[in-house]
Amino acid sequence: MTVPVRVSEHDLLGLLSIVSDHRADDPGDGLPLSLFEHLMQQVPCDEISFFGLDSQQQAVWFGQGIPATGDGDMDAFWTHFWDSLPCSYPERSGDLRSVTRVSDFYSARQWHATGMYCDYLRPAGYDHELMLCLPGGPGRTVRLMFFRGPGGDF
């Protein structure tokens, strides 16, 4: 069953402002910070991150986000990457069209028992993820991720 969705004029204007090409803070390389700010207004989150991931080389080949944070414990990330269903889903499935959440793969109890959560995301204060992927070449993906701490899912 399809649930009807209503969109207000305010929401449409907010979405339109995201795709506007009139950004004074265009950095040349990467995305303007104002774009991240607009996305965070449309999809409330604690952090937004845009990065390139090379699963074959176990490397992040570019990255930016708000707030600007370090990469965390990348050894822990790569240790648990292939066992983490939401993290490795694009590589395992080849599906780069779906927008996914942790809750698409695990219950909260299951997620909190994973190595990825315990060793990588919990120390950063995050419980929830929303991920959009684009192809980045063989073994590579470009990811836009939204993170939230404890509380409501996306």
Predicted regions and their residues:
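Regulatory input/activation interfaces that engage signals or partners
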Residues: 4-153
